[in-house]
Amino acid sequence: MDVIRNICTALAFTCLSCLVLPAQGGYRVEGIVVDRFGPVIGAAVVEQGTSTGASTGLEGEYALTVSGPSALVEISCIGYASQVFEAALVPQTVILEEDNEFLDEVVVIGYGTVRKDDMTGSVSAIKAEDLNRGALVNTQDMLKGKVAGLLVTPGDGGPGSGARIRIRGSASLNASNDPLIVIDGVPVAQGAGGAMSNPLDLLNPNDIESFSVLKDASSAAIYGSRASNGVILITTKKGIGTAPQVTYSGSVSLQNISRKVPVMSSAQLREFYSKVYPPGTATGVSIASLMGDSDTDWQDLIFRKAFATEHNVSIYGNLNNRMPYRASIAYSGQEGTLRESRYDRGTADISISPSFLDKHLSFDVNLKGVYSYSDYADGSVVGRAAFFNPTIDPYWRNSDGTIDYTTTNGYWNYGNGRGEAFIPNTLVGPSPLSQLYDNISYAHSSRFIGRMAADYKVHGLEALRFNVSAGLDITATDSYNGVRPGSFQACSDTENLAIGQHTKGRHVSRSTLFEAYANYNETWGIHNLDITAGYSWQNNWWSDRDVTYFNLTDEIKLEPGETAESRYLTYRRENYLVSFYGRINYSVDSRYVFTFTARSDGSSKFAKEQRWGFFPSGAFAWNIAREPFMDGLDAVSELKLRLSAGMTGQQDGIGDYVHLARYNLSNDPYHTYDMGAAGYMDMLTPQAYDPLIRWETTVTYNLGMDFGFFKDRLTGSIDAYVRDTKDLLNSVQVPMGSNFGNRLMTNIGSIRNKGIEFSLSGIPLQTERWSVQLGLNGTFQSTVFTKLNPTEDDNYYIETGGLSRGTGGYLCRQMVGYAPYTYYTYMQKYDSDGKPLQNEFVDLDGDGAITEGDRYMTDKSASPAFFYGLNVKVSYGDWDFGFNGHGSEGTWVFNDFASANSTSSLDLNSGSLPNQAQLVRKTGFRAPNSAQQWYSDYFLEDASFFRMDDINAGYTFRNIGKWGTDIRLAAGVQNVFVLTRYSGMDPEVLSENGIDGTMWPRPRTWSFRLNVNF
């Protein structure tokens, strides 16, 4: 590390010496700069109006020659209030005071920044020090429980898995409900695929400076057609100070699953079956023939304790106070708790922001790259392991007890014969170990995102500036999926017996962005006018290709006479978005603030007649605390009322050519025909299409208030909102005889979201040694459909949400007056002890039979009625401690795992013997479940919960050695515990419909972290 430090320091000061030309024969100023903790390293000491400057060293010392004793010397450092002295009056020791309002004062918004006092929209800004701490591999983990109205549902236990992010609920039926994510001014392409399926995977969490979450139309309308689901602006760290600074952070972690699927052990299973199916009965005899004499915990065999590590190195500084720079590299490696799974990621980030012409001309260059590699394990093996026969030895054995690798690679499976004569029982499928070890699936991805911007402040008219930028986002992913030769899966392939086949895929995506805008910002007395007008052009392009090979020879799998080009087509698509936008901010004495925003978008996803959409908004803010009648109320430091209304649009998630008739060539070899010497392929009839399909549009109304008391020791905000989305994209029935498919995607429907959200931050204790900070946020929300078809038929519905058992049925309905994915179930009957009566339900229509007419619409769905976050930070001297948690109330989950495994009834025709869930002891079900039992409201459970996301503690050693190094040692736990009444694996179900078929359990992580600042 010293070598890196020395090299970086030498390079930086070499450049500095080339750029700084100190005055000759002038007045010499020298001294030290400190804060309340000690020396301030890297503070800028500059003679105002010149390029003459210096930076403080390791002990805070500096020396500078200025033009004369009356020259003005400015001493500044990021995060501190600047101080200016005449050269002759500079004290020997300059004490800098922390500028607590530095990061609070300016908030990043679309295409610029705004002073917090002048902000009219509903925007939540999170600073770096307020983000969740700990061993963070995923960027979304930093946001959990931090922002009112922002719901982050983590993915499953797979390493590198993404998350579902929703801002103020879901407002679309078939289009995307994901927010727009903008990283350093570049909108991030969603769904890059493969190992880059997580759109935030591009970022190293240690590189992030702040988040801004734009929630209402006033703040988000500047992004127009992509902003209906809100916008998350991510700003990465830039160079600060002057002298080069080097930081290192690293961690090691141990992960284990917090719980297993509750099933019986082999001893419990033998006892249970002997009671339910006595040995003398026919079923008992069949069970005995399928039982082994082993005691196998299949879940223990597929899971493991997993290790993870991460390392981050960065260097930053500011050459001559004119070129802030920062560079970082990082690596993270994470084993999965499922064996055979792993995730590796390397990132690099470079940021340079030089300025010229007395800072009138500036450039901003941001380059980010990431490489990731994923070994995937089949998550469905969790359920298979839970219910696979625990009395069976997991391996084929030779007579001497060694493993017989000639049969399905040594892993025991249901079937007949051994070795090459083995015939698999395909009704059962592979054993857990075969499924885990003999399936091969991996992907590696490379991604680059870059942006270059030039900003010119007009000489003589400094209020006017022009900004031009270009951005590029490129992803390339190579994937592989197949099975090992000799495996159960390969033996099941009748066409390529014991050889099988595998598929290689290639996915490439590219997003190109060009933007230009002008900004005019002028202040006349108590009046301030800020005008922005701009143009944006974006092209998104994708290419996908999959090729199938023989496993052993790696030869392309072709039919006689075929070519690879004819069999394996490359699918390409693209779209364009052209936009004009503008914003006007006008304030009077920072008391009355008006904002008007408009954006016009033209999208190639729609026909010419519907291509352009216009999205306006307006907002007003009244800073009541600045009114004269508030004078003397010293307890009130902030009180601001906000009103806004506006329109945003939605074009994502609907395909690129939905307004066109799309004909497709079949690549099925059985759909080719020979006529003489010529061969012909099927041309598939297009699906029905609507040439006048148009934008989904959302109108949002927001009323909010920001407040602060006791010099901002207590701050907070409260917002009430209503979002009306119309022209929902919905799939409707096509009349018979149209010669199209039977469904049509068109604009029919509307949905309303409304809610109240609040956030509170308090500092109940602040002394020289002690600091206690508390944060709490919460959101009450509801969502209902207000229209779903053109006839205003309130009985119209859309079925969705299939179960793992049952055939042809759906559990959820979309219906006017109800929330999305409302459960549609049978009402279970119970005995006098409260136990469910198997296959008995309430006859709601009174016809004497249990039919489809006895199902009813519940008032329950997976959308929480209230969700919240809790954050606590405590410090004493150099010690720090904190924890973060989040939870929800009024969330209902259908336990599909319980529904599918609620009876001990057996079907032995498949030739296999399953394990039993512990649940069967509770239900007492012995007969086969009826079709209605799978859909019983008995399995509908309250999944309200509180999750302790992380607990961490650390100690900082300050100003160590000749480099003045700060070292922080910390330890923490993530996913500490969950408080819930839900009986399933985890109350946070990733599927939006709330159907829980069990999943790869989210791990608990124990970590140790080291941070070093040179």
PLM-predicted stretches and their roles:
Residues 247-293, 386, 657, 746, ...:
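Conserved small-residue
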Residues 262-264, 483-485, 547-550, 791, ...:
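Short Gly/aromatic-enriched secondary-structure transition segments
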